[in-house]
Amino acid sequence: MNENVVIKVDNLTKDFGDQKGIFDISFSIKKGEMVGFVGTNGSGKSTTIRCILGFIKPNKGESYVYGKESWSHSSSFIKEIGYVPGEIAFPDLNTGTDFLKSQAEFLKLKDFSHANRLIKILTLDPSANLKRMSKGMKQKTALVAALMHDPDILIMDEPTTGLDPLMRINFMDVVKAEHNKGKTILMSSQSFEELENSCDKVIFLLNGRIVSIASIDEIKNRPEQDFKIEFTNHEDYEAFKALDYTIIRDQPQYHQVTVSIIKGRVNDLMKDLKIYHLKFISEVKYTLERHFKKIANIKEEN
């Protein structure tokens, strides 16, 4: 295995029956990369993560961390990973402080300085009773526990789900700071925007299978630009459609088209549009969400 590859998943399959599970999943994550998982509920994000951590034995295929097979050798690398689960269930302890101390003992951690910095950044009160903690406080406590020993790998399963917008930003600022320090990060999320603003690449899962692995740089720097144009009358709409433009979406009921052009040809488009009566023209940004909908063949809303 390439020494620069930290996590490798090779034809991983875990079949729960009734077409539920993951099937022939393959990808790799290099040192220092931040990779996102996105997909509908039940698409296999959590199952893949649990296989990587050695919590679930696959029916077929393997996953590796630092070149060590997950199911057989997870004990040799698990302490080098910071993990934030999708469903946080604390042990029967009184406070967040008690939980963090128990984690420190498990990790044989004696220096609490990094944990204290994280507590301050996240404005967390660890003395709060675990059972009375809000969703946000539980997420913060879990993140501190995952990062307190300064691991090289961080794996998080939808860590910001249920957080209010301000807390989500605060949480992701900490994650981005870890990425900037060179940490290798795998994070699943329901938020396309969150992944687009933080990841190097994103893996799309649908019905337990990978349908696309997208580079964020390629999405942001694609050579085409898309424009939505609405005409005031049917005649102009039909006349424009007869021109040599790539129409990627046609909505005749609104006299509206979306065209894709090569960057640098905007002036040509504007010249061609001068003779028509327009209601509006606007650029349609190509986002991670649009890419996923295109791959998954999901129709965009108006």
Language-model features: where?
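Residues that scaffold the ATP/ADP-binding catalytic core of kinase and kinase-like folds
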Residues: H73, I219, H291, I295
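Residues at or immediately preceding the N-termini of alpha-helices
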Residues: S70, S74, F112, I216, ...
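ABC transporter nucleotide-binding domain
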Residues: M172-S260
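Short, charged/small-residue-rich alpha-helical element at the C-terminal edge
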Residues: Q225-N302
